[in-house]
Amino acid sequence: MHREEITLCGHKLSLFQAEKADCPLIVFHSFSDEGEAVYQELRKQNAPECNFLSIAIHDWQREMSPWYAPALSKDGEAFSGGADAYLESLLSAILPWAEERIHGKASFMGIAGYSLAGLFALYAMYKTDVFSRVAGMSGSFWFPGFKEFCKENTMKSLPEKLYLSIGDKESKTRHPILKTMQENTEELFGYFRSLGIPCKYELNPGNHFQDVNLRCAKGILELLR
């Protein structure tokens, strides 16, 4: 395994390159720089060899949100809806950089993320056909209007595999929006399965902040199998 790092389009990229040619390329968006921990967890789980591109997203509320939504709390930050602009950078600059550096040609590209990045991973499927496998771990499917968006629009290409997961305590809250997370995740899982997409849904123990790296690795592992 060889690791290469660069800052491109304002984002820190870490590319863990497979030794073999023509291995899959997994694109993983992280809140800060936890990509290496997720990659090491994948290795511990004896995951099939892959190229792993970790992208640290620092303007999380903007770049991972598909449209504007108010803050979840009085002191919180609003979601400003910059996902389309970020996706353009991903497709036009970041992915070409990674593709030039892997051995051979990726057998497939998958996209994965946790929390708001899990929502972005699904959103991207409606905007581009580059990715053929997608995983949203503890995805922010409480996001206002997202469930409806998924049902009212068509993916650019139906994925070969789709993975969703959530912690069993994540919806145990009085917050009127956040408490819809498990219900919305399960409803979307049922909807995607009805489209004939090979889907897996996993209910993990704990709240939103428990075993994050392990949950991410489990989801990515499903894409690689």
Predicted regions and their residues:
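Serine-hydrolase catalytic machinery in alpha/beta-hydrolase-like enzymes
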Residues: 22-101
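The feature captures the conserved acid-bearing segment of alpha/beta-hydrolase catalytic domains
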Residues: 141-213, 217-224
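Gly/Ala-rich beta-loop-alpha elbow adjacent to hydrolase catalytic centers
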Residues: 112-117, 121
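A domain-start/cap signature at the N-terminus of enzymes
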Residues: 1-24, 50
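Alpha/beta-hydrolase
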Residues: 28-30, 137, 166
